[in-house]
């Protein structure tokens, strides 16, 4: 039926093939500093592009609504067993198609519309799914938000007071733009004191946690959700880890609650990524991620930029650009012209609009994957500062772009 020699993307759909090739070139020739992006291994991509994409498998291993699932059962069980071993979890669901759907699955399992939840404010580094009014979490539930204190660390005392005042049914921990270590044990004590569930969204920190270089929330939380890409370096998808007593409720919430047939090719890719993350090499990689982030942040500070919270203790940092009189939007564009990819991001109490912002978010996972070390991280920090000091100077942009080209040639991703 299918002629492998002829059924290539290039032959079947030249337009898509061209876009893919252009994106391949961009990934090779640009320095990727978006904190939520990374490069998956060829093995992960091969699993995701396998024949498993053809198989419907509604249900769970050993209990499917379709025949012919004996081999995908093996795949899903391996993914479950590996992610449990990776994080020390009692139970796991590997079917969520995204981190947002993983969060939604917990909400659907444990809450009713109108219940009160408490999460970190999006304006202070939280995530849309932690109660933002534009997200379903903010529309379905009564939301109380906690944020940062004057030192730009999480205000645990204020969170404690809010929890006792509002008695939320569920407290959400985790962030999308927060550089310090989160005290999950302290938040668990707050939740226990008010009779709330604790859900930790560790999407940004999962790879660091797997390697033991960032605090593990699993011993303290009722539920832990995550994406499988970002610092974990797997395919795009989600996972829910939970205490064994909640496994049946969570499984029912995912299927048939909010999803139908699982994406078995993606679950296979998750399993491969989990196996990679269980290796000693992955721990070494994450240690380098932390070191590169520290060097990058220190370099930017030396060049007159302010890092929100004063430092980074993880892979991510939020850079306040106001000292350079440039917005996040303009900085993103200028750095993009120099082939350095970042994303504009609001800083705490940002006076600018969300699509403009006063900051950019930077992360070290992708550049570390391609082999950058502290020396390269320092150089990247100086290149960023050069662009931000002269964002409209063509000569500066051209010089930085040439230095980026030299770096990316010396440290290829897939070539």
UniProtKB/Swiss-Prot annotation:
Reaction(s) the record says it catalyses: (6R)-5,10-methylene-5,6,7,8-tetrahydrofolate + glycine + H2O = (6S)-5,6,7,8-tetrahydrofolate + L-serine
GO biological process: glycine biosynthetic process from serine; tetrahydrofolate interconversion
Chain sites annotated for binding (6S)-5,6,7,8-tetrahydrofolate: 122, 126-128
CDD domains: SHMT
InterPro entries in alphabetical order: PyrdxlP-dep_Trfase, PyrdxlP-dep_Trfase_major, PyrdxlP-dep_Trfase_small, Ser_HO-MeTrfase, Ser_HO-MeTrfase-like, Ser_HO-MeTrfase_PLP_BS, SHMT-like_dom
A single cellular component GO annotation: cytosol
Highest taxon above the source species: Bacteria
Subcellular location: Cytoplasm
N6-(pyridoxal phosphate)lysine sites (modified residues): 230
Pathway(s): One-carbon metabolism; tetrahydrofolate interconversion; Amino-acid biosynthesis; glycine biosynthesis; glycine from L-serine: step 1/1
Top-tier EC class: transferase
Classification via Gene3D superfamilies: Aspartate Aminotransferase, domain 1, Type I PLP-dependent aspartate aminotransferase-like (Major domain)
This enzyme's EC code(s): 2.1.2.1
Protein task: Catalyzes the reversible interconversion of serine and glycine with tetrahydrofolate (THF) serving as the one-carbon carrier. This reaction serves as the major source of one-carbon groups required for the biosynthesis of purines, thymidylate, methionine, and other important biomolecules. Also exhibits THF-independent aldolase activity toward beta-hydroxyamino acids, producing glycine and aldehydes, via a retro-aldol mechanism.
Entries under HAMAP family matching the protein: SHMT
Name under which the protein is recorded: Serine hydroxymethyltransferase 1
Organism: Burkholderia thailandensis (strain ATCC 700388 / DSM 13276 / CCUG 48851 / CIP 106301 / E264)
